[in-house]
Design a protein with these regions (language model features):
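Positively charged, low-complexity intrinsically disordered leader regions
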Residues: 1-31
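Structural motif
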Residues: 15-17, 119, 148-151, 180, ...
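Substrate-binding N-lobe of the ribokinase-like
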Residues: 2-5, 35, 39-105, 312-313
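Short acidic, glycine-rich surface-loop motifs adjacent to enzyme active sites
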Residues: 146-159
């Protein structure tokens, strides 16, 4: 089953709309303290750029062969060009809107000896205006008939307002297009009526203002009912995942070693949505996403999953189940 599904990934078209970011890493060694101030001097050995935020969701989809439309806001600056040029060839960037009044979001990290010493952020707080919203919606309308799914990747940077999110969700519903969301708890009411959301356990509890002692299944069902969702997939770290569909499906974790959880949520929503769009049931899609999540947490930094890794890992977990 998994091989046939993954073979179909190359036929799937997905639009990702969300907070695009560029992650910059400056790697080096610390051998002395600066004479100018009591701070370490980092001798730089490597500098690299990695797709972050919603751009990492896109990168995960592209790595598995999907055809991806990228939607979001960037500045009219050099970092926007770096971000756009970093996308794989199977990513269409025509839905990206370049604006004058804010910079492309960049997170620069200085790392020495596997230790993060400093992070510098280039971003400004904003909410998308009506004109920008209308452009994004009109661009999406031009492609909606050919799409299998839309992912809304919310990092609470001001793009996915309630107005824009509801217009996107309604457009998807009218055209029988799956729409999934990785939401921040404070914005979850923006996404009423989506096909599915993929919060982690902490986010799920915060979204319904549940006490820590409340049963996770009650929380999951509350989320589904309150926000009129078809399904909810709650990621639970070492406890695995729980899918709230017509039934409750507990999916145990399998990750052998956890090195870095950076971007794991991006991988989960990417694979969950892609598998569903390719013909899996929600439960099958959750199991495939679980396998993918287990792979990326075993890698250092923001990572993607290959088709080969996903097939092998899925078969190792589920072939005897």
């Amino acid at each position: 089953m998994i091989s046939r599904l993954i073979e179909n990934f190359k036929n799937i078209k997905i639009a990702v709309i969300g907070d695009l970011m560029l992650d910059e890493y400056i790697m080096g060694k610390v051998e002395r303290i600066s004479p100018e101030a009591p701070v370490p001097v980092v001798k730089v050995t490597e500098e690299k750029f990695v797709l972050g935020g919603a751009a990492n969701v896109i990168n995960n989809l592209a790595a598995l062969g999907a055809n991806v439309y990228c939607g979001g806001l960037v500045g009219k600056d050099k970092n926007a060009e770096k971000l756009i040029n970093a996308f794989p060839k199977n990513v269409d960037c025509n839905l990206i809107l370049k604006v004058d009044n804010r910079p492309t979001i960049v997170k620069k990290r200085v790392i020495a000896g596997h230790q993060q010493l400093l992070r510098l952020d280039w971003e400004e707080e904003f909410y998308i205006n009506e004109d920008e919203e209308n452009i994004i919606i009109e661009n999406l309308k031009n492609h909606i008939k050919e799409l299998n799914a839309v992912i809304l990747s919310d990092y609470n940077k001001g793009l996915l307002t309630k107005s824009l999110s509801q217009k996107i969700i309604n457009l998807c519903r009218e055209n029988n297009v799956i729409v999934t969301v990785d939401p921040k708890p404070k914005n979850i009411s923006n996404f009423v009526g989506a096909s599915s959301i993929t919060p982690n356990k902490k986010e799920a509890y915060a979204a319904v203002e549940a006490s820590p002692s409340e049963n996770i299944d009650i929380v999951g069902e509350k989320l589904k009912e309150k926000y009129n969702l078809d399904t909810v997939l709650v990621t639970r770290s070492e406890e695995g995942m729980t899918l709230y569909d017509k039934e409750i499906h507990n999916i145990p974790t399998y990750a052998k070693e956890v090195y870095d959880v950076t971007g794991a949520g991006d991988t989960v929503i990417s694979v969950f949505t892609l598998a569903k769009a390719a013909g899996a049931t929600w439960e099958e899609a959750a199991k495939i996403a679980n396998a993918a999540g287990g792979i990326v947490v075993g890698k250092i930094g923001t990572s993607t999953v290959s088709e080969k890794e996903l097939i092998e890992t899925y078969n190792n977990i589920y072939s005897n189940n």
